[in-house]
């Protein structure tokens, strides 16, 4: 892939008039795309689920719930709702990023191998539009939790078309490697972030992120 084939974009703000949703049969859940101001009840329920999932592994501080709860930095969010009406997973999307300094990835990699590569990958793509997936989780006790995680992962690239950007990125805690940056371009399935060394974190089986995008 060469970025010369891509066109720089102007950042745009998205405003939904209503929630978007689709039934995902293999996961037996309804996947909803919304915005914090449009559906504050669903937004708060999603956040509380994220808090429970992260607290289970003692990493709730990484959510920074006080800072994100007003939704001001969140362009849109995804919520998976099971047949009983419970929110069993979700993720939120921020951006477009103006530079690597807008991404929490540079904080996560501070003092670790791969920081310069993370910065370069974000900065090289920022002119073409990059959004970041944050606060992803799935209730590991839910029926079909693996299918729910897969449904969320399949849906996350939708943020590129909704927000008019070329790339989606994120960091995720893997069971062995720790967080690794991943990118998906609208014209390519390349995942250049796979070569970046991770940073060790506790095993986090129900924290889901862009490692499932490929």
Regions found by a protein language model. Give the residues of each.
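Conserved acyl-donor/pantetheine-binding loop and adjacent beta-alpha core of acyl/acetyltransferases
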Residues: 92-139
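Catalytic micro-motifs at enzyme active sites that drive phosphoryl/nucleotidyl and oxygen chemistry
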Residues: 64-69, 77, 119-123
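Aromatic (often tryptophan-rich) hydrophobic motifs at membrane interfaces
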Residues: 115, 133, 157-160, 168
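Short beta-strand micro-motifs in enzyme catalytic cores
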Residues: 74-78, 129, 200-208
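Conserved acetyl-CoA-binding loop-helix of GNAT-fold acetyltransferases
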Residues: 144-160
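A short helix-loop-beta-strand connector motif used in the catalytic cores of GNAT acetyltransferases and
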Residues: 68-79, 86, 98-102
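Terminal substrate-recognition subdomain of acyl/acetyltransferases
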Residues: 1-61, 69, 136-140, 161-214
């Amino acid at each position: 892939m060469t970025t010369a084939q891509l066109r720089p974009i102007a950042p745009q703000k998205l405003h939904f008039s209503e929630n978007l949703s689709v039934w995902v049969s293999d996961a037996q859940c309804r996947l909803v795309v919304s915005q914090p101001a449009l559906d504050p009840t669903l937004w708060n329920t999603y956040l509380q689920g994220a808090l429970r999932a992260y607290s289970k592994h003692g990493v709730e501080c990484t959510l920074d719930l006080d800072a994100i709860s007003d939704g001001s930095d969140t362009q849109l969010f995804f919520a998976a709702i099971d047949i009983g009406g419970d929110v069993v997973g979700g993720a939120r999307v921020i951006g477009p990023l103006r530079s690597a300094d807008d991404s929490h990835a540079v904080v996560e990699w501070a003092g670790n191998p791969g920081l310069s590569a993370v910065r370069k990958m974000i900065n090289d793509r920022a002119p073409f539009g990059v959004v970041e997936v944050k606060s992803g989780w799935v209730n590991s006790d839910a029926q079909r939790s693996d299918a729910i995680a897969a449904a969320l992962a399949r849906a996350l690239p939708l943020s590129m078309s909704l927000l008019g950007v070329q790339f989606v990125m994120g960091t995720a805690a893997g069971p062995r490697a720790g967080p690794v940056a991943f990118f998906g371009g609208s014209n390519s399935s390349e995942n250049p972030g796979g070569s970046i060394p991770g940073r060790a974190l506790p095993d986090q089986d129900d924290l889901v992120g862009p490692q499932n995008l490929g």
